[in-house]
A protein has these predicted regions:
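Glycine-rich phosphate-binding loop of ATP-dependent small-molecule kinases
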Residues: 1-188
Length: 188
């Protein structure tokens, strides 16, 4: 199974991505975790990433695509992947789709977790992970960035017949079951 997870900050992409990965026996690749790992190792790339993460801004496409596609290609040996937090823009999606098609590992589905703004605000306030990118100001900015840059991806993936919309406001288990039902229909 090869799945891309989309949704605003606080929609549950990480939680649901891990559940999908566990159910289908494939790696869960989180762009946020890859970025935070790179920052923790204090590489030059990590230092560059840190500036963008601290501000809640999108990381430049060339940097993101390189990091993510290296990991996706490595993960494909495990029979697929669940990718969460990437792509965030149509140009990223186009570049990733080309690289994946060239490697014969195109996404089978794009799961979009829909959550009302008031629920997102509550979730981000309650998350309590201690992440710098969860402060109220940065969280608001991340939601604005999502709306401006990521929402066009919904049209992009709808036109390609890949988008699966899931109401992610119910409890976690109910959301997982809705996702599994949709993916099981795709996976046959």
């Amino acid at each position: 199974m090869r799945v891309i997870m989309l949704g605003p900050p606080g929609s549950g992409k990480g939680t649901q991505g891990e559940r999908i990965a566990s159910r289908y026996g494939v790696p869960h690749i989180s762009s946020g975790e890859l970025f935070r790992d790179e920052v923790a190792r204090q590489t030059e790339t990590g230092k560059t990433l840190q500036r963008y993460l601290d501000a809640g801004d999108l990381v430049p496409d060339d940097l993101v695509i390189s990091l993510i596609m290296d990991r996706v290609l490595a993960a494909h040996a495990d029979g697929g992947w669940v990718l969460d937090g990437f792509p965030r823009t149509v140009p990223q999606a186009e570049a990733a789709a080309k690289a994946a098609a060239d490697a014969g590992i195109s996404a089978q589905a794009v799961v979009y977790l829909e959550v009302p703004p008031e629920v997102l605000a509550e979730r981000l306030a309650d998350r309590g992970e201690g992440r710098a990118d969860d402060s109220a100001q940065v969280a608001r900015h991340r939601l604005e960035v999502f709306t401006e840059y990521t929402r066009p991806l919904l049209d992009y993936y709808t036109k390609r017949g890949l988008l699966v919309r899931i109401d992610a406001s119910p409890p976690v288990d109910a959301v997982s079951e809705a996702i599994f039902a949709a993916l099981d229909r795709i996976d046959g």
